[in-house]
Amino acid sequence: MAGLVKKTTGLVGLAVCDTPHERLTILYTKILDLLKHFPKHAAYRKYTEQITSEKLELVKLEPDVKKLENLLQGGEVEEVILQAEKELSLARKMLQWKPWEPLVEEPPANQWKWPI
């Protein structure tokens, strides 16, 4: 990691991460490992895997934190870490919910018709 470690994020309640590359690598790897348990045809798996792989590649290639923040386009690197933590949490929930499975019962006719 090139350059000095910043003293503050400038965001209330969001502490500076001393090892952002390591933290992001761990989070993105956990997300990708979890996605392997999803069916290959699941839309959530396809798109989340693609986005997460791209971000992980950027983390591996760019040692400078400021440049990495610009490449990831998610604000401060600490905000990106927070986003990755939330994505990991969502992936765990999606695995429980199994949205790729068929509905338990058919929806009522005209359920999505508007106006009624």
From Swiss-Prot:
Modified residues (N-acetylalanine): A2
Signal peptide: none
Subcellular location: Mitochondrion inner membrane
InterPro entries to which the protein is assigned, alphabetical: NDUFA5
Coiled coil: none
Alphabetical UniProt keywords: Acetylation, Electron transport, Membrane, Mitochondrion, Mitochondrion inner membrane, Phosphoprotein, Respiratory chain, Transport
Modified residues (Phosphoserine): S89
Single GO BP term: respiratory electron transport chain
Pfam families the record matches: ETC_C1_NDUFA5 (PF04716)
Modified residues annotated as N6-acetyllysine in this record: K30, K46, K60, K98
Residues modified as N6-succinyllysine: K98
One GO cellular component term: respiratory chain complex I
Family: Belongs to the complex I NDUFA5 subunit family.
Oligomeric form and interacting partners: Complex I is composed of 45 different subunits.
The protein, known as: NADH dehydrogenase [ubiquinone] 1 alpha subcomplex subunit 5
Recorded name of the encoding gene: Ndufa5
